[in-house]
């Protein structure tokens, strides 16, 4: 089979969108979240610190971080109907498929009337997304 050469088509040099959240290749390479290099965040910051940074616009101080971690922990319980759906997903399913299905089911169980509570919904999703894996390894009851 002949190797296919990559063409020159694409978005090279084109602005695809603007956001305050992240930049990709602003200085030629790399990724930043709210001005922080992703490699530094990956090495030194906790998941909750990066989530707080993305959602609130700044890295949390220790008090803000403690409050945010406690808030996320308080939102981790899963409705039984969601647990039932997740348990029926094949063990070999791709994690993104599991998250999509879980998110869709949770959206049917915890209905949003409008966008006024979007920050709370984001925090809820951040709290519950890791739980399917934890349930599989029986860390949680």
Spell out what each predicted region is:
Residues 1-141:
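Hydrophobic alpha-helical bundle cores within soluble ligand-binding/oligomerization subdomains
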